Every structure is written in structure tokens, then in C-alpha cells.
Amino acid sequence: MRNVLLPLAMALLVASNPAMAAVGEPAVSDPDIKPRSPTVPVITDDTGLFETFGGREWLVKIMDDVMPRWIKNPRTRPFFENSDHERIKRQLVEQFCVIMKGPCEYSGRSMAEVHRGMNVNEGAFFALTEELQITLNARGVPCAAQNRLIAAIAPMHRDIIDR
């Protein structure tokens, strides 16, 4: 578990420090990660990562598995208790699919707009990411694939954290 969370922590640290990460740019120096927009960066022009994750069907299963974890975790529960879980899962599937260059379109709002006023703190953001990685591990997603996804979504940290 430690060797999975260390790259995550590093990516999030870089993403959360403006001196270390350019605004709108990926948190790591991976030439395959290309930002498409502040809402949905695209990892690569190759669909290999999308296929490694098992395509849209597996993204749906991952979201079905992780949502109860977010609701149960005391650090993330307040942000999910009174929300439309099905809509959130659907939009996260779309977002992750686009990030991984799958055949999807993201229909949601920007991360800054969605999270404005929610008072999401770093502890909640990190807990959400930890629960996602636990779920990805349980689903057998290879560590390298997890790290590429986490590195691509880490810059969204700036748009989600309020305090």
C-alpha cells in the first residue's frame, strides 16, 4: 500500500503547490499527459490506459464500488450525504473516460464550479483519493495505470480545495 500512496502523495503535493506546478499543466513531467482543459485533462492519444482499466464497463464498476466508501468515510461523507450519487458516478465515469482517451464526452461542469462553496479541505480530498486507490487495488488495476490516472487528476486539486 505504501508504494502505491507515495506516488499519489507526490503528485498531489506537486499539484497543490503553485511554485511546483504550472496552472493548467499536469502535475508530473510525463510527455504523454496532455491537458485538454482545466476540467478534463487527457492523458494520452493512445487508448491503452482506457483498455487497461477495462473500458467504460469497468469504470462504472469502479464508481459503484467507491461511492459507498466515500459515503462511509467520515472525511468524505459530508460531501456525498445529500447528493445525487448516481449523477456523480455517471459524471465521474465520463470524466475518467475522457481523461483516458476513451470514447466519451464529459457533460459536467468544471471542477471549480462544481466544488465552489463546498469548503472541501485537503484531508477530504486526500481521503477521496485514498478510497479511490483502495478500490482500484481491489479491482486489480495495475499500479502504473493507477499512478497515471492519479497524476492526470491531481491538478484538479487546485479547483476542488476551498480551504
Where are these regions (language model features)?
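Positively charged n-region of N-terminal signal peptides that target proteins for export
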Residues: M1-V4
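Bacterial N-terminal signal peptides
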Residues: P7-N17
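Core of compact, soluble alpha-helical bundle domains
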Residues: A21-R163
